[in-house]
A protein has these predicted regions:
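Short, conserved active-site entrance elements at the starts or edges of catalytic domains
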Residues: 39, 162-176
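Short, active-site-adjacent cap segments at secondary-structure transitions
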Residues: 18-21, 137, 191
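A glycine-rich beta-turn/hairpin centered on an aromatic-Pro dipeptide
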Residues: 170-192
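A short glycine-/small-residue-rich loop at the edge of a beta-strand within enzyme catalytic domains
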Residues: 153, 157-161, 182-183
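Internal nucleotide-binding/catalytic subdomain
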Residues: 24-153, 157
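Short coil/turn segments at beta-strand junctions that form active-site/ligand-binding loops
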Residues: 9, 46, 188
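A conserved helix-loop-beta module that forms one wall/lid of the active-site cleft
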Residues: 1-26
């Protein structure tokens, strides 16, 4: 609470584990008063951390890294509100998600936030999925988090959009060159 009072700005309250059974996942607070109101009421048995609140223009990008290359798959967005407009803050897990097939990185998330990691991916021999979530603020993307997973909302949608999901994921796990193929007409996915 002292940090919020000293900084005088809102924070997103997050759980570092976020398992399906976690007592909290994310609580988006848009004012310092919201943040201060939530802190004493949170079950912090798994710990919490505060993430700077930068607004609502949030998006994610999911790619596969294999054989030293980054293969963009989709841009995704999680639904964090139960209704259209500002009718309440998020107090729990996302309600669902959208994915857009995006091998060309239409919004620049991979170019700005994943490509700079390519030397590190190669140095350590990383292979697998990588997801970045960011907020667009002051005309640039600001990283909120990186994850090395497809995610429970986006993973099944990506698999259903790919014509060769087993081959693509299998080759990625082995660190082999990838050639993801897309099902015709599968441009978007939605999960509620």
């Amino acid at each position: 609470e002292a940090l919020v009072r000293r900084e005088g700005r809102p924070f997103v309250v997050k759980n570092p584990l976020c398992s399906p059974t976690s007592p909290i996942h994310t609580i988006v607070c848009e004012t310092p008063e919201d943040t201060l109101a939530w802190l004493p009421r949170i079950d912090d048995a798994e710990g919490i951390f505060l993430q700077e609140y930068l607004g609502r223009r949030e998006a994610g990008h999911i790619a596969l890294v294999s054989d030293g290359e980054i293969h963009s798959l989709v841009t995704n967005q999680e639904y964090k509100r139960a209704f259209d407009g500002n009718l309440g803050i998020v107090a729990g897990a996302p309600l669902g998600g959208l994915v857009e097939r995006d091998p060309g990185d239409r919004y620049g998330l991979a170019r700005e936030l994943l490509e700079p990691l390519r030397p590190w991916f190669r140095e350590v021999g990383f292979r697998g999925p990588v997801q970045v979530t960011a907020i667009r603020h002051d005309d640039r993307w600001h990283v909120l988090e990186y994850n090395v997973r497809l995610g429970v909302t986006s993973g099944p949608m990506i698999a259903s959009m790919l014509a060769n999901p087993l081959e693509t994921f299998g080759r990625c796990a082995l660190g082999l060159p990838l050639n993801p193929q897309w099902r015709p007409g599968k441009e978007f996915g939605c999960n509620l």
